[in-house]
Amino acid sequence: VTNNDVLRRIRYILDLNDSMMINVFAQADIDVSREQVSQWLKRDDDPDYESLNDKQMATFLNGLINHLRGKKEGEQPKPEKSLNNNIILRKLKIAFNLQSDEILAVLQLEGFSLSKHELSAFFRKPEHKHYRACKDQVLRNFLQGLQLKYHPKKNDLEGFSWPSLDDKEK
């Protein structure tokens, strides 16, 4: 999963327009242009596509935390110079204010099951003996689950049915 993929999915999940995306970066005290945002959101095969580096992605995630949870007083956290799926998952957990049970439920929406122990291994320090690297499949399923939770398709409305012609005649 590339940083650009994560950025595109978060934009879709939260239904953010370009101005809102610029605002999220501004929440982390970084100014970006509409053109930069547009280039990051383009498809990988587009000639104007520009790759989002780890520091820029970390800045966006810090801004997302500030945007969704409110900015804390004092100095802002420094963006990490290199990211991995574990850090991205942790920052999304913080931004969406999710507990372990809620993360497991989001993964379950996508039909992906993990135990609490497997999940907690993703949030441990890399030196810890029970640390586990978060694979692309887990992050992809988590983002897909968030999409189902926060941005359901219109045709996913459970229990909806059109009234039959018989009902109208009565």
Pin down the residues of each PLM region.
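Short N-terminal segments
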Residues: 1-2, 33-35, 165
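Leu/Val/Ala/Ile-rich N-terminal alpha-helices, chiefly Sec-type signal peptides and the beginnings
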Residues: 3-6, 11-13
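A structural feature that tracks compact, well-ordered secondary-structure segments
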Residues: 10, 16-28, 35, 40, ...
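Solvent-exposed, non-transmembrane amphipathic alpha-helical segments
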Residues: 27-31, 41, 45, 57, ...
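Intrinsic, low-complexity N-terminal interaction/targeting segments
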Residues: 48, 52-55, 59, 72-86, ...
